[in-house]
Amino acid sequence: MRLCDRDIEAWLDEGRLSITPRPPVERINGATVDVRLGNKFRTFRGHTAAFIDLSGPKDEVSAALDRVMSDEIVLPDGEAFYLHPGELALAVTFESVTLPPDLVGWLDGRSSLARLGLMVHVTAHRIDPGWSGCIVLEFYNSGKLPLALRPGMLIGALSFEPLSGPAARPYNRRQDAKYRDQQGAVASRIDKD
């Protein structure tokens, strides 16, 4: 059962759940907390790679990722990031989220943005128990027009679901946690699998 707005506020008040900066009550609605777009992005460079063999040797996968992913782009205040039709880009939420070991989070994109062709997360919308950090967004523009995305705009909504008990292996305690404490638009680390 997902937390309702009253329970989300109580978990925040008690320190069991942390969202920094703490959202105002107007952004906690029904069963979700609205989150905003941060100012860090990452894109695919123009490249001539025919493919990336995701199950190939780790050093080759790592080298291929280095060739195709841009360095992190940090937008100055007031500037927009333009996502063109058919493009994929990574970004982060403005808010940093810390979940306890007995709570899982879910990120959903905004319906108003989806109706313009913007996918906010291509597949990865679960936020593991024990997670701490900004949430990476996997943007894809499936529409017909470029979309101007500005830091600070409402981009999605988080919901939270208590588990039957604390996870035995929460994300922040796993040795194989590839994205622990991420604050920026971290590129894929599939080569670390």
Swiss-Prot record:
Pathway membership: Pyrimidine metabolism; dUMP biosynthesis; dUMP from dCTP (dUTP route): step 1/2
Keywords: Hydrolase, Nucleotide metabolism, Nucleotide-binding
Catalytic center residues: E138 (proton donor/acceptor)
Alphabetized SUPFAM superfamilies for the sequence: dUTPase-like
Region described as Disordered: spans on this chain: 169-193
Residues annotated to bind dCTP: R110, S111, S112, L113, A114, R115, D128, V136, L137, E138, Y171, K178, Q182
UniProt catalytic activity: dCTP + H2O + H(+) = dUTP + NH4(+)
Keyword Hydrolase: yes
Annotated InterPro entries: dCTP_deaminase, dUTPase-like_sf, dUTPase_trimeric
One of the GO BP terms on file: dUMP biosynthetic process
Documented EC number(s): 3.5.4.13
Membrane listed as a keyword: no
NCBIfam families found in the cross-reference section: dCTP_deam (TIGR02274)
Family: Belongs to the dCTP deaminase family.
Known partners and oligomeric status: Homotrimer.
PANTHER family assigned to the protein according to its UniProt record, in alphabetical order: DCTP DEAMINASE
Function: Catalyzes the deamination of dCTP to dUTP.
Name of the featured protein: dCTP deaminase
